[in-house]
Regions:
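Short, structured secondary-structure elements
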Residues: 2-181
Length: 181
């Protein structure tokens, strides 16, 4: 999270205790969550007037999920599972379902294909460390991903649809909702 303060360095606490104290701080998740949010392309809501365009209102729930997951020492593999399939892993768990904000974050109201293409592009870069953009249209001479591979990968995301659920106790999504896949 944050580097130790001068006071923390001057105490008689051991190095290990100071590190444990810093890792237990909620600032740890805030600091490192910021880096993961860059990788996973987190962006707050924006639209035109009241109309949703490229992201989701209340996507801050997903941002907080990232921070809390890091602070709880949730494994990276579990975080990825919840981001891609939290609604299937544990549909009754709000925490697991909130992870699917990853899929909702790049929602594009005008064209589902644009949303799917962006999700494929972001997922391949973030989780596989490769680009798949060229393979959408053709096999590339030097890339290991063929056009068939691209559409096989896309088939994983095809069943996903966006849901905009009001949270328990709220009367509408606009007041406080949970964007999810």
């Amino acid at each position: 999270g944050l580097p130790p303060t001068t006071e923390q360095l001057l105490t008689n606490a051991s190095y290990e205790d100071t590190v444990d104290q810093l890792l237990a701080s909620p600032h740890y998740g805030e600091r490192w969550g910021r880096h993961w949010m860059d990788v996973w392309r987190y962006s707050d809501w924006y639209g035109l007037g009241g109309m949703l365009r490229h992201s989701q209102k209340h996507l801050w729930h997903w941002r907080d999920w990232i921070i809390n997951s890091l602070n709880k020492d949730k494994g990276y593999d579990r975080m990825i599972q919840e981001m891609l399939a939290g609604d299937e892993l544990d549909p009754q768990s709000r925490e697991a379902v909130t992870g699917t904000g990853y899929l909702a974050r790049s929602y594009y109201v005008f064209n589902r294909n644009t949303w799917l293409d962006a999700t494929i592009e972001h997922s391949a870069k973030a989780f596989l460390g490769i680009t798949m953009n060229c393979a959408k249209c053709h096999d590339h001479k030097y890339d290991p991903i063929s056009q068939v591979d691209y559409y096989n990968y896309r088939s994983f995301f095809e069943p996903h649809h966006l849901r905009l659920d009001a949270l328990p106790g709220e009367t509408s999504f606009d007041k406080n909702g949970l964007p999810r896949a």
